[in-house]
A protein has these predicted regions:
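A glycine- and Lys/Arg-enriched "phosphate-lid" helix/loop adjacent to the NTP-binding pocket
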Residues: 107-158
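ATP-dependent small-molecule kinase phosphotransfer cores
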Residues: 36-100
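P-loop (Walker A) phosphate-binding loop of NTP-binding proteins
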Residues: 10
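NTP-dependent small-molecule kinase module
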Residues: 25, 84, 114, 147-176
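Hydrophobic anchor at the beta1->P-loop junction of P-loop NTPases
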Residues: 7
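ATP-binding Walker
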Residues: 13
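Walker A/P-loop
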Residues: 16
Length: 176
């Protein structure tokens, strides 16, 4: 059985920080999809100049559509190329309103038993409130309320009132 632990959740919840602490505790490498995604996207045609042009000329929705079209490939590749490690997914890479894209992400994550959704609170309103103090609020409510991460997760851990080390230990306990 593989030992990958995959952390998902909205921006600012602490996936990368908890992932680093967990990787240190378990003596596993840490892989952050945010660090690798654009390299993966370029393999299938993503172009920074084109993304910039779309952003400048066609506004946010067109830019989001362009970038989001590459995200399932990034998720697939980070899982195919990295084993026996802690992987933290980007805040938006596991959420999509596009059924075909979400199905690809769901299929890629389905074989993994240790997919852990991190959220500040069981209460979505409280999660949004907490996350807004950490990051730009524009997209957070959508990410917290979307059913996508809940559908992908095998475990859900609420971070409210816990230290980073306590969250790390809870992830470790639930995934071993």
């Amino acid at each position: 059985m593989s030992s990958e632990i995959i952390l998902i959740g909205p921006f600012g919840v602490g996936k990368t920080t908890v992932g680093r602490l967990l990787a240190e505790k378990l003596a596993l490498p840490q892989v952050s999809l945010d660090d690798l995604c654009y390299g993966y996207y370029q393999e299938i045609g993503w172009n920074a100049q084109e993304a910039g042009r779309i952003y400048e000329q066609e506004a946010g929705d067109a830019f989001d559509e362009y970038t989001c079209s590459f995200e399932p490939y990034g998720v697939e590749q980070v899982l195919l190329r990295n084993h026996d490690c802690v992987i933290d997914m980007g805040g938006g890479q596991t959420v999509s309103e596009n059924e075909t894209r979400f199905a690809r992400v769901q299929d890629a994550l389905a074989p993994y038993q240790n997919v852990v959704l991190l959220l500040p609170s069981l209460d979505p309103e409280e999660s949004v409130r907490v996350l807004k103090t950490r990051r730009s609020p524009d997209f957070l409510e959508y990410l917290v309320r979307s059913p996508c991460n809940y559908a992908l997760a095998k475990h859900v851990i609420y971070t409210e009132g816990k230290s980073l080390e306590q969250v790390r230990d809870e992830v470790s306990d639930r995934t071993q």
